From Swiss-Prot:
Signal peptide: none annotated. The lineage of its organism: Archaea, Methanobacteriati, Methanobacteriota, Stenosarchaea group, Methanomicrobia. Gene3D superfamilies: 3.30.1430.10, Ribosomal protein L3, domain 3, Translation factors. Pfam families: Ribosomal_L3. This is Large ribosomal subunit protein uL3. Residues 1-29 are annotated as: Disordered.
């Protein structure tokens, strides 16, 4: 007799599968960091994919020490600017923002995203932080940093993307001193992570709109003979007679894609400053020419071209060893086909 049971089609881990609230991904957790204070994140914009030839430095690999072809993703990473510091406190109900210390003066480009505060008193904000620090109420410090898409030609927008980036390392006083020194200044990816290290990549996936249960959940097509009097691409049943409602686990049609996803332990193969050296003739498909710094990531990442990509140091690197990759060749062949 054949097996009469099987695992359910599709994962319930990401339910409800609805559209992301914002194109800017949000982190709820950050990696642990010891040592000098540092920022734990950065952001860029997805360009496209190509391939490189590099020496396989993975220990015990069948091709160890030999040249292999590796698919890579390129992200354009113009410098970000720190607009403000946000100080958090914790109580029995969780984490709450205590105060914000904004840079003076603010960049005019930032007014496209937020309304610049009028009659802002930075002295009062600093005093509120000092009093909270003396009382032992300060729990975490974050930097409010924003991208500069106006410096890019591949992304047709000028509105900066504003996001929180955690400051870690040392005690709270050292974190504040480090972050305060960054107010109004530009930061680079090389200040956050090094070449050869592993990072977590977070983005909003490609949106596919409303899709049926077959494509959305992977349910089996009804047999041709059984679908003569009805439909072929739908579930065979919506559930039992009791309870008298359709349960949320039943695979049904609905929104597919445009959801936040994180891929862990993606290796940083190269961080370059001259985008022209990696741009193919005619530019990247659906993107164009890279005019700023860029980073080469091993493998694929979520989202279409032009999508905002957030990068943080790997939160669970495990046994991965950080080595400087030996790249022999980067393909700049046109992707036009």
């Amino acid at each position: 007799m054949p097996k009469i049971n099987r695992p359910r089609r599709g994962s319930l881990a990401f339910s409800p599968r609805k559209r992301a609230q914002s194109p800017i991904p949000k982190y709820k957790s950050w990696p642990e960091h010891s040592g000098a204070p540092a920022l734990l994140g950065f952001a860029g914009y997805k360009v496209g994919m190509t391939h490189v030839l590099m020496v396989d430095d993975h220990k015990d690999s069948p091709t160890e020490g030999k040249e292999i072809m590796v698919p890579v993703t390129i992200i354009e990473i113009p410098t970000m600017k720190v607009a403000a510091l946000r100080v958090y406190t914790k109580d029995t109900y969780g984490k709450h923002a205590l105060t914000e210390i904004w840079a003076e003066p603010l960049d005019s480009q930032l007014s496209r995203r937020v309304t610049s505060p009028k009659n802002y008193d930075s002295t009062a904000a600093k005093k509120k932080y000092s009093d909270a620090l003396a009382a032992g109420l300060v729990a975490e410090i974050y930097a409010l940093a924003y991208t500069q898409p106006a410096t890019m030609s591949g992304v047709p927008k000028k509105v900066p993307d504003l996001m929180e980036i955690k400051v870690a390392g040392g005690d709270i006083a050292k974190q504040y001193e480090y972050a305060f020194g960054l107010l109004g200044k530009e930061i680079r990816l090389s200040n956050v992570i090094e070449t050869g290290a592993y990072a977590d990549i977070t983005a909003i996936t490609i949106g596919k709109g409303t899709q049926g249960p077959v494509k959305r959940w992977g349910v089996t097509l009804r047999k041709r003979k059984h679908s003569v009097g009805g439909k072929e691409r739908h579930v065979g049943t919506l559930g039992p007679w009791n309870p008298h409602h359709v349960r949320w686990e039943v695979p049904q049609s609905g929104q597919m894609g445009y959801q936040q996803r994180t891929e862990f332990n993606k290796r940083i193969l190269k961080i370059g400053e001259n985008g022209a050296e990696i741009t193919p003739a005619g530019g990247f498909l659906n993107y164009g020419v890279i005019r700023n710094a860029y980073v080469v990531i091993k493998g694929s990442i979520p989202g279409p071209a032009k999508r905002l990509i957030r990068i943080r140091p790997a939160i669970r690197q495990g046994e991965h060893v950080v080595r400087s990759p030996a790249i022999q060749f980067v393909s700049v062949q046109s992707k036009q086909g």
